[in-house]
């Protein structure tokens, strides 16, 4: 192809000018570190497990709860009939000694039964009451609250009035009355504790769902013809679920303490079954001579409750995008970001 010649005989000024290359480079820009960029992206997307390992208190709390769960599942099978086997020759033996065998390491009661075996079996009983009660209340209250908060109107009004009626009665007092009238079995305890805790999840889920139903992504799904149930299942519940799980962790502590209180009053778990609260009640008359009969199961209640509360506090921060950076930063960098008031700034 020939280059056009102007009237003066010169070539146009742009004829020999090299054209710029607008293609994008295949590799990373000069001076950049692709490994460092990948590391930064991975740090921003830390998993909950890695965040848990960064917090020592939350890690210990999770380990305690896992240990309690393992003891509740496998402990009674390993202990056999040790919790009910009586031997008056070993009555009221002191704990923390292996002179009487490993089964009496935590001492024995007035009938010669192993406190260790009874604690293990009581763990399953206490957990088998707390977990179903929390699970039933969580499922019913959450679905009910999300449904009422999304649709608003009369559904929300009726649901809130029902919740107010249930919450107007003290939950523990209502449980005492119901269990006094009916048979105080494990099923009845789970049912009454679950019913009294449903309004907690109902009110929380209703508030979260009512706020989300006017968000842009929910309006977009509604505009494209998505059904209400599909919107609730795909867009509302995943956002509300972390808050409800944190609340369920706290409610687990309350239900466990409520069951222990009912057993202590004599209208909870009944012999021959055994729970932590029942062990505290049965050992209170031996506090001066055999303190371990009440102190050890009481200590199990306290440690489990503290562990669940610590883990719930960590979970609340870990599932909140606005506060999750507190767990991702090292402790030294976190302290460095906190402003310190000096005399000059004052």
Where are these regions (language model features)?
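Glycine-rich helix-loop "coupling/hinge" segments at transmembrane-helix boundaries
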Residues: 167, 178-181, 193, 207-209, ...
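Gly/Trp-centered helix-boundary motif
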Residues: 1-138, 142, 146, 154, ...
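Alpha-helical transmembrane segments
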Residues: 71, 198, 202, 251, ...
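Hydrophobic alpha-helical segments of membrane proteins
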Residues: 131, 135, 139, 244-252, ...
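Generic hydrophobic transmembrane alpha-helix motif, especially the helices
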Residues: 105, 109, 136-141, 146-215, ...
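Short helix-capping/hinge motifs at transmembrane helix termini and TM-loop junctions
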Residues: 75-83, 149-153, 178-184, 196, ...
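Amphipathic cytosolic juxtamembrane alpha-helices at the membrane-cytosol interface
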Residues: 113-128, 132, 152-160, 213-214, ...
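Short amphipathic alpha-helical coupling elements at transmembrane boundaries
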Residues: 47-51, 114-121, 157-167, 178, ...
């Amino acid at each position: 192809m020939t280059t056009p010649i102007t009237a003066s005989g010169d070539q146009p000024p742009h004829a020999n000018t090299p054209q710029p290359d607008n293609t994008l480079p295949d590799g990373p820009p000069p001076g950049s570190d692709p490994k460092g960029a990948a590391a930064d992206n991975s740090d921003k997307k830390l998993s909950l497990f890695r965040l848990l390992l960064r917090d020592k208190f939350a890690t210990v709390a999770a380990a305690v709860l896992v240990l309690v769960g393992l003891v509740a599942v496998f402990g009674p099978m390993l202990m056999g009939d040790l919790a009910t086997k009586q031997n008056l020759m070993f009555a009221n033996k002191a704990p923390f000694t292996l002179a009487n065998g490993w089964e009496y390491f935590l001492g024995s009661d007035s009938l010669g039964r192993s406190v260790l075996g009874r604690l293990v079996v009581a763990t399953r009983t206490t957990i088998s009451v707390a977990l179903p009660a929390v699970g039933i209340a969580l499922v019913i209250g959450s679905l009910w609250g999300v449904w009422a908060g999304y649709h608003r109107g009369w559904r929300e009004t009726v649901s809130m009035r029902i919740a107010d009626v249930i919450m107007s009665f003290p939950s523990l007092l209502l449980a005492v009355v119901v269990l006094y009238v009916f048979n105080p079995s494990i099923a009845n305890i789970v049912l009454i504790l679950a019913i009294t805790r449903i309004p907690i999840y109902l009110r929380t889920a209703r508030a979260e769902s009512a706020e989300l139903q006017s968000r842009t992504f929910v309006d977009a799904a509604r505009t494209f013809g998505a059904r209400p149930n599909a919107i609730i299942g795909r867009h509302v519940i995943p956002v509300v679920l972390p808050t409800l799980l944190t609340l369920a962790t706290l409610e687990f502590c309350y239900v466990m303490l409520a069951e222990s209180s009912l057993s202590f009053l004599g209208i909870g778990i009944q012999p021959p079954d055994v729970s932590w609260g029942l062990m505290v009640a049965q050992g209170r008359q031996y506090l001066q001579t055999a303190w371990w009969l009440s102190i050890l199961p009481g200590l199990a209640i306290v440690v489990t409750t503290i562990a669940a509360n610590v883990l719930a506090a960590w979970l609340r921060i870990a599932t909140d995008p606005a506060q999750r950076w507190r767990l991702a930063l090292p402790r030294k960098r976190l302290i460095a970001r906190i402003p310190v008031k000096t005399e000059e700034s004052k």
